[in-house]
UniProtKB/Swiss-Prot annotation:
This is Urease accessory protein UreD. Required for maturation of urease via the functional incorporation of the urease nickel metallocenter. The gene is ureD. InterPro entries: UreD (IPR002669). GO terms for cellular component: cytoplasm. GO terms for molecular function: nickel cation binding. Keywords: Chaperone, Cytoplasm, Nickel insertion. It is found in: Cytoplasm. UreD, UreF and UreG form a complex that acts as a GTP-hydrolysis-dependent molecular chaperone, activating the urease apoprotein by helping to assemble the nickel containing metallocenter of UreC. The UreE protein probably delivers the nickel. It comes from Acinetobacter baylyi (strain ATCC 33305 / BD413 / ADP1). It comes from the Bacteria. The keyword Cytoplasm applies. Disulfide bonds: none annotated. Belongs to the UreD family.
Length: 291
């Protein structure tokens, strides 16, 4: 991964590694976790099957509750044919102040034909003076489906903290059959003009991105445009600062504001609608979100 020039040099021996590998398959009745391997304090807290269709809800937890300078955290998740998994976290993630040390997070998702993965972590807080690099790489087979989001909060809002120093870089890539469908790159420093510019954050503290790929039979532009228009009307009724676009057959929603709960609720509502349209499933929010 290309490193931003704004990051201070970091020796690899100072890095602290944690890794979690998960695999899901359909056993004929429900989706089960057939592969689980972890290194360091990151693991699956609980698996639940709250839906009659056998969708597996997995809660992953990183006990230190955040990523500090020198940490190197990796998630690898794969699904086999006909599996449907929902992966979430019990609370907000955190990028801690690092005293100049870099921190890394890598997310690799591989989704097989006729399977679905919903990657739904709760928000991530970027502390002032954090040096953070994050990447998400998603590979879908031709008939695979995906929904996922990323929500970032600049500073600790309860302390009125802003992002005055440090650096953040995020790279998102989504492929289908090894063809790049979406590439999204974000990079900024503390006090960067982009944070106050109307072409960037415009002084806001919360940003979010939502991505979704429909089952193959719903990828026609006519279907997707109808679904997006209905969701736009819902966002207007909810009075949230969300925009929706269609990138080929990938649905993209963006949030820019100051209320992370509003971002979460908006994205959860979009997910609920797409589940109904594409899979004939109820919204079925992960129970951990209500605790």
């Amino acid at each position: 991964m290309n490193q931003p020039q704004d990051f201070p040099p970091q020796k690899s021996k100072a890095l602290w590694y944690a890794q979690l590998e998960l695999g899901f398959r359909f056993d004929g009745q429900r989706t089960i976790m057939n592969h689980r391997k972890h290194h360091g304090p990151v693991r699956v807290q609980k698996m639940l099957w709250p839906e009659k269709t056998g969708v597996c809800h997995a809660i992953i937890v990183h006990p230190p509750a955040g990523i500090a300078g020198g940490d190197h955290l990796t998630f690898q998740v794969s699904t086999e044919r006909k599996a449907h998994a929902v992966v979430t976290t019990p609370g907000a993630g955190k990028w801690y102040k690092t005293n100049g040390k870099q921190a890394f997070q890598h997310i690799y998702l591989n989704i097989a034909n006729d399977s679905t993965l919903e990657w739904l972590p709760q928000e991530t807080m970027l502390f002032d003076a954090a040096y953070a690099q994050s990447e998400t790489i998603i590979h879908l087979d031709q008939t695979a489906s995906f929904m996922g989001w990323d929500m970032l909060v600049l500073g600790r809002q309860a302390r009125l903290e802003t992002f005055e120093q440090g650096c953040y870089a995020n790279r998102f890539k989504l492929y289908r059959n090894h063809k790049l469908l979406v590439a999204d790159t974000l990079r900024f420093k503390g006090k960067d003009r982009w944070l106050s510019s109307c072409l960037g954050m415009n002084g806001h503290a919360v940003m979010g991105s939502f991505w979704a790929v429909a089952p193959e039979k719903y990828r026609a532009t006519l279907y997707l445009e109808q679904h997006i228009e209905l969701i736009r009307e819902l966002m207007m009724r909810m009075d949230v600062p969300v925009t929706l676009t269609l990138l080929d057959d990938v649905v993209c929603a963006r949030f820019l504001g100051d209320d992370v709960r509003a971002c979460h609720d908006a994205f959860a509502a979009i997910r609920a609608r797409l589940r109904r349209y594409w899979f004939d499933l109820d919204e079925e929010f992960p129970r951990i979100w209500r605790t």
